[in-house]
């Protein structure tokens, strides 16, 4: 006897939970290869996130300020749907998308309270990678 088709894929779809959070934190991780933006509430629970690679940019185009701007707009719009009005921005990393991602969040109408650089700096910890010779 043949098995009946299982609707497990249709059952797993969950409705998006709408939170009503006014204040949050935007974590911008700007590496040399990609930029990842995560918007959380004050406790650190993620409300929305986006990355340059997730927006269709591949290869070296992921590491451009424009790709970071597009990713910030996507994450910011999703956060506005959750009720975000004020953000503190924490930027980590030396990448090219640092400034453009903050500008994109401000252009969406989100009020930016503070901008902090939380790039980890070693107190002479691990040995760095060897210098690149071109």
Swiss-Prot record:
Family statement: Belongs to the universal ribosomal protein uS11 family.
Organism lineage string: Bacteria, Pseudomonadati, Pseudomonadota, Betaproteobacteria, Burkholderiales
Example of a GO MF term: rRNA binding
Protein name according to UniProt: Small ribosomal subunit protein uS11
PROSITE patterns, per the entry: RIBOSOMAL_S11
Gene3D superfamilies tied to this protein: Ribosomal protein S11 (3.30.420.80)
Keyword S-adenosyl-L-methionine: no
Protein species of origin: Polaromonas naphthalenivorans (strain CJ2)
Summary of the function given for this chain in its UniProt record: Located on the platform of the 30S subunit, it bridges several disparate RNA helices of the 16S rRNA. Forms part of the Shine-Dalgarno cleft in the 70S ribosome.
Entry keyword set: Ribonucleoprotein, Ribosomal protein, RNA-binding, rRNA-binding
Pfam family membership, one: Ribosomal_S11
Assembly information from the UniProt record: Part of the 30S ribosomal subunit. Interacts with proteins S7 and S18. Binds to IF-3.
Record InterPro entries: Ribosomal_uS11 (IPR001971), Ribosomal_uS11_bac-type (IPR019981), Ribosomal_uS11_CS (IPR018102), Ribosomal_uS11_sf (IPR036967)
Gene Ontology biological-process annotations: translation
GO cellular component assignments: ribonucleoprotein complex; ribosome
Gene: rpsK
Keyword field contains rRNA-binding: yes
């Amino acid at each position: 006897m043949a098995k009946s088709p299982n609707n497990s894929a249709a059952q797993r779809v969950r409705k998006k939970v709408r939170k009503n959070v006014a204040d949050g934190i935007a974590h911008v991780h700007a590496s040399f290869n990609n930029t990842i933006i995560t918007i959380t509430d004050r406790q650190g629970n993620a409300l929305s996130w986006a990355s340059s690679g997730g927006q269709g940019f591949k290869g070296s185009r992921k590491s451009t300020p424009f790709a970071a701007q597009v990713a910030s707009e996507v994450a910011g719009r999703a956060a506005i749907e959750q009720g975000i009005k004020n953000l503190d921005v924490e930027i980590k990393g030396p990448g090219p998308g640092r400034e453009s991602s903050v500008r994109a969040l401000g252009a969406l109408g989100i009020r930016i309270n503070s901008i902090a650089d939380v790039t980890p700096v070693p107190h002479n910890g691990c040995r760095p990678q060897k210098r690149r010779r071109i």
